[in-house]
Amino acid sequence: MLFRSSTSAWPNIGISTVLILVMLVIAVIGIRITARTQVAMAVFEYIVLIGVSIWGLVYVLGHHAGTFPITRGWFSLSGIDGKGSLSAGLLIAVFMYSGWDATIYVNEEVKHRRVNPGRAAVFAVAILVVLYILPQMGLQGVTSPAKLQANASSALIYVTQVLGGGGWAKVMAVALVLSVIASTGTGIVASARIAYGMASHRVLPPVLGQISRRFNTPAIGSIIIGLILIAATWAYLLSASIGNVFSDVVDVTGLLFALFYILTACAAIVYYRRRIFSRVWDAVLVGVLPLASVVFLAWVVVKSLQGAPNAQRYAVIGIVAAGLVLMFVARFVLRSQFFHLPRESAPKSVVE
């Protein structure tokens, strides 16, 4: 491990709070320094992860003692055990993708904003395929499934230690820490921009839509999001059953993002409705694919809710209900102009 473990949660709380504050300051200062920081951390993470994965793949293919060879069963859906395992895995995939589409939320702050954010979100899917499949192939066979299960909370660090010893394990630990820090920064930036967009239409309090004259960022919204994140981190680390809490958070967040992407796909179909019948490629791109994603994600949500514990169901229902209440408040109490805007549609031309 990179740091010595402690029986007290307070050292972890202190370190986590400091890291969140650092990423919050970077997010407030500006999008350029945020992007450069994210790129620097990402490059280190990917070099380590891909390098160790290739190392593990060569190690497994070399048939070293204790390794488990790659088989076709690794890539077969028939190898998924247990009722609901497929939908649970897909839900985790949705959770893992959330945050990789952050470029969409900063579309007003990037060059060529009509095309670059969307392309980056699609490009992220290709990156994810490499980042998740390659480690699965390269690291799963390094040691026995029983040992991987016994070290499930730090599997990447354990496998790296098997391959190269404690020194390389610490390098992997640093990469994982940077991954968490980068995700924290992404969450602050994306959430603050979402809040800014909603506040600018008076769906949320106007204070969240204020832009700092000095930094040209939604500073107040970023600070509020950062404080909420700190409070959530404290609650999580002080929980008596951290493992269960983490599992519940992943599942509930995955369900909420699945619902979010369903609504996004529906909005895309409505916005591009004039292009659906213009030509075959447009029909596939802005009609068939979004509709297929709606059906697919709806199936994932239904299957996941059927097998979810009551606590997770109530959490999802409660959050959605709270969102509906806030929507009605914005519509009928705050008189948000958003609900009075004309329905927009893209020009009837070739999709860029």
Regions found by a protein language model. Name each.
Residues 4-11, 40-173:
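Helix-loop-helix junctions that connect adjacent transmembrane segments
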